[in-house]
């Protein structure tokens, strides 16, 4: 049996895409995943271009793979994802031993691309944006545990000045409503109990229904919540400007919708938000969160922050810290700004000194970590309903799952509990998890 070695950089969308790559190549070529590159026949790198030095990271990884091909010339090396979409033929110029370059929207063509390389021994590049064809050409979904990701849309049409996603994944395209329902139903039949809906701006979802009507994310959630086997629904990532009243109503009406929201704000300064072209103000962001908390008072809120965007002053950063205090974020993905090639912000002077960026990042992360620890400590003594997803990564002799507010809980239990909803009494708050006992 031939082997596939697959490495993934980046977000949950990339994790979802990587799973589909493995599925489509298993279906077409019988490739089995391996964690040992020494025995692999096909190497795939699914890339992300969001963070700094993304291209350098890709070529470093490819450099580590090159000796495997030199030893075993039949090996095929492919590069997919957003860096592939952004760089295209440049990857072949810098790493001529690469055989396949493909974008996020063309992963369904991997079998044909692989056949072409095997037959002609010539590199191929396919980084087009063929609408939503990708989803129509993939095998039936395959569950791996009680929790699953389901991509409901692709791309982004917001064109924030710092972001490469519209250029690497294309503009927003929503999957047809019935296709999403069918995929979730298939996963349910395989034992999935928790669904996380994915999209670059998932709350911009507009799926065509069979009767010609268009469903938004809130309506999709209502339909999924009506499925008996679904216990919990999550979604990520949202854009504040598209966070609608309908979605707030869904939080009020659907208890299966998890008590957690990730809503990236990026900055607490209106001036910086305008420079980022985020299309909302701090007041508008706060207003949406207040409306949400009116129906879900104890909802957990996480966010993204970019530190040191061009022109960010001490006053701008202080405004961000004030927003963090007011909103009570208990988790964040925060990182130092670095220009992404091809974006409007890359034309701006990167004028915030690196030492200042690092200092601000440390201040922000310390504040949010302190709030997270406070919330975790407040959960000690409470009873929490969790979905048991499998053995704990840190404590393999224990089981693990997540709370409504997205915290990892480890506890002693038997393997048959995996895939079940159980109630745990929290006994201890640890730095990155909770520990408890079955009630």
From Swiss-Prot:
One of the record's GO molecular function terms: metal ion binding
Cofactor: [4Fe-4S] cluster
EC code: 2.8.4.3
Residues in MTTase N-terminal domain copies: 2-119
Residues the record lists as binding [4Fe-4S] cluster 1: 11, 48, 82
Domain TRAM: 377-439
Pfam family membership, one: Radical_SAM
Family, as annotated: Belongs to the methylthiotransferase family. MiaB subfamily.
Protein name in UniProt: tRNA-2-methylthio-N(6)-dimethylallyladenosine synthase
Organism this protein belongs to: Coxiella burnetii (strain RSA 493 / Nine Mile phase I)
Upper classification of the organism: Bacteria, Pseudomonadati, Pseudomonadota, Gammaproteobacteria, Legionellales
Gene for this chain: miaB
């Amino acid at each position: 049996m031939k082997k596939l070695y697959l490495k993934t950089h980046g977000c949950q969308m990339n994790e979802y895409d990587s799973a589909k790559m493995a599925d489509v190549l298993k279906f077409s070529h019988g490739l089995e995943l391996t964690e040992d590159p020494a025995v692999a026949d096909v190497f795939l790198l699914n890339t992300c271009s969001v963070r700094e030095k993304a291209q350098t990271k890709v070529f470093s990884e490819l450099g580590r793979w090159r000796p495997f091909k030199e030893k075993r010339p039949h090996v095929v090396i492919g590069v997919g994802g957003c860096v592939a979409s952004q760089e295209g033929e440049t990857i072949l110029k810098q790493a001529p031993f690469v055989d396949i370059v493909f974008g996020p929207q063309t992963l369904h063509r991997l079998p044909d691309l692989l056949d072409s390389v095997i037959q002609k021994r010539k590199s191929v590049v396919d980084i087009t944006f063929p609408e939503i064809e990708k989803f129509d050409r993939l095998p039936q979904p395959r569950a791996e545990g009680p929790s699953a990701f389901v991509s409901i849309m692709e791309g982004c049409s917001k064109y924030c000045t710092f972001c490469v996603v519209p250029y690497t994944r294309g503009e927003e395209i929503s999957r047809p409503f019935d296709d999403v329902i069918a995929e979730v139903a298939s996963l349910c039949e395989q034992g999935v109990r928790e669904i996380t809906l994915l999209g670059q701006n998932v709350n911009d979802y507009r799926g065509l229904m069979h009767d010609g009507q268009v469903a938004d994310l809130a309506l999709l959630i209502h339909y999924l919540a009506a499925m008996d086997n679904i216990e919990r629904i999550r979604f990520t990532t949202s854009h504040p400007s598209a966070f609608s009243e309908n979605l707030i109503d869904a939080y009020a009406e659907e208890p299966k919708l998890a008590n957690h929201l990730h809503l990236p704000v990026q900055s607490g300064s209106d001036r910086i938000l305008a420079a980022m072209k985020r299309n909302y103000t701090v007041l508008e962001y706060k207003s949406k969160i207040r409306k949400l908390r009116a129906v879900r008072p104890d909802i957990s809120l996480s966010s993204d922050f970019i530190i040191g965007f061009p022109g960010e002053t001490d006053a701008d950063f202080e405004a961000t810290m004030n927003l963090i205090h007011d909103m009570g974020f208990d988790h964040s993905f925060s990182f130092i700004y670095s220009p992404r090639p091809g974006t409007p912000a890359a034309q701006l002077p990167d004028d915030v000194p690196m030492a200042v960026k690092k200092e601000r990042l440390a201040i922000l992360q310390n504040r949010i970590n302190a709030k997270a620890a406070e919330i975790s400590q407040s959960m000690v003594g409470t009873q929490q309903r969790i979905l048991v997803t499998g053995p704990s990564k840190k404590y393999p002799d224990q089981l693990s799952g997540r709370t409504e507010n997205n915290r990892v809980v480890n506890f002693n239990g038997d393997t048959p509990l995996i895939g079940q909803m159980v109630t745990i009494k929290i006994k201890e708050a640890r730095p990155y998890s909770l520990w408890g006992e079955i009630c």
